[in-house]
Amino acid sequence: MESSWPAQSSFSYYNQGSMQTSSRHASSPTNEYSDRTPRRSAAQPQMPAFLPPPPPHGHQLTESGGDSLPSFSHSLYSPYHGPGGNLPSSNPHGMAHSMPSYSHISALSGTGSGFQYTNHSPMGLNEPLTSHSRSQITHSYHDPPRLPGYSSSPNLHQLSPVSPTAHLLPSMQPPSASPSSSSFPSSIPRTPATLPKGVKRHSLGSEQSFDSWDDEQEMSSGKVTGDRKHEKDSQPWGMPQEEYKKLNPKDKKQVRNRIGARRFRAKRKDYVNQLEAGIRLRDDEITNLQSQLESQRNEINELRLQLKLPLLPRGELSGLGLTMETQGQMERWENNDSMSR
């Protein structure tokens, strides 16, 4: 690489001497871009660390070596613009495109003035970029960021694994999800018509199983009424089952209501009879207790007569079964007690 350096330095820099020199012939691309290693800048300590100023506005370039470059119309230093401009069409040495180099400064002289400027091509090459390198750079700089809310984002499957729109019909899904349906992962389960079909089957089954529901009701009612002696298992509704099945739903409902009312009246009558029987038992018990109380009172009075004590008055029985005595009776009791002593 060292032997391929040009004998004369074909790189002009911005200094007073370069502005006073006459127009020089541009060296061939072979001598100009022979070395593309970072050692080029280290070998020339006089190379300035800054870029020369651009030419004045409206400055036109001359053709150098049969290559045409775009016009430079900026008033400031041009920033890095990615590949895409018109680049020369020759690569003499076939160097790699990604090797860093400071050799993109070329000696191009203007026609109207002696100002020289630098070639601001980002790569400093004379050959067009291949489709592979162009696509890499384009994607690295101009690829728009992907948002997680869009369906084209690769992180969409990290949201909810079961989306509320996954159970919708294809015609009910939002239009934004239809063009990018291929970007969804195949692992997400989709059952778009499960619920509607299930509901439809349920509704059809309910209509078709109306008679079976009646049969179940008949069987259950037959079990309940089988314990009763006044009803037969063969006719739980007061009629044969064949006749009951031939009736329309309205008549069946009337029959069921009539039988239900009849059962309710019978049950209520039984309950009332039980209550009346209990009342009769309580009345008999009260009568027996009253007779016992009267007999015991008579016995006490006989004993008091033997002791020459006043008889027990017949007091009115309270609701609690206690006797109520007046104040005069209490005084007589006290007097009798004092006299007996």
Curated annotation (Swiss-Prot):
Effect of loss of the gene: Reduces LAC1 induction mediated by nutrient starvation and leads to greatly reduced melanin production.
Domain of life: Eukaryota
InterPro entries the UniProt entry points to: bZIP, bZIP_sf
Region called Disordered, residue ranges: 1-95, 118-254
MF (Gene Ontology): DNA binding; DNA-binding transcription factor activity
Annotated region described as Basic motif, given as residue ranges: 250-269
Gene Ontology cellular-component annotations: cytoplasm; nucleus
Domain bZIP positions: 250-308
Leucine-zipper as annotated region, ranges: 279-307
Skewed-composition ranges (Polar residues): 1-32, 61-76, 128-139, 150-163
Biased composition (Basic and acidic residues): 225-234, 242-254
Induction: Expression is induced by nutrient starvation. Expression under conditions of nutrient starvation is positively regulates by HOB1.
UniProt-annotated location(s): Nucleus; Cytoplasm
GO-annotated biological processes: melanin biosynthetic process
UniProt biased composition (Low complexity): 178-192
CDD domains linked: bZIP_u1
Location (main, coarse): nucleus
Keywords linked to the UniProt accession: Cytoplasm, DNA-binding, Melanin biosynthesis, Nucleus, Transcription, Transcription regulation
Family per record: Belongs to the bZIP family.
Its job: Transcription factor that promotes the production of melanin, a pigment that serves as antioxidant, reactive oxygen species (ROS) scavenger and that protect fungal pathogens from radiation and host immune responses.
PANTHER family given in the database record: BASIC-LEUCINE ZIPPER TRANSCRIPTION FACTOR E-RELATED (PTHR47416:SF8), BASIC-LEUCINE ZIPPER TRANSCRIPTION FACTOR F-RELATED (PTHR47416)
Protein name per the record: BZIP domain-containing transcription factor BZP4
Source organism (scientific name): Cryptococcus neoformans var. grubii serotype A (strain H99 / ATCC 208821 / CBS 10515 / FGSC 9487) (Filobasidiella neoformans var. grubii)
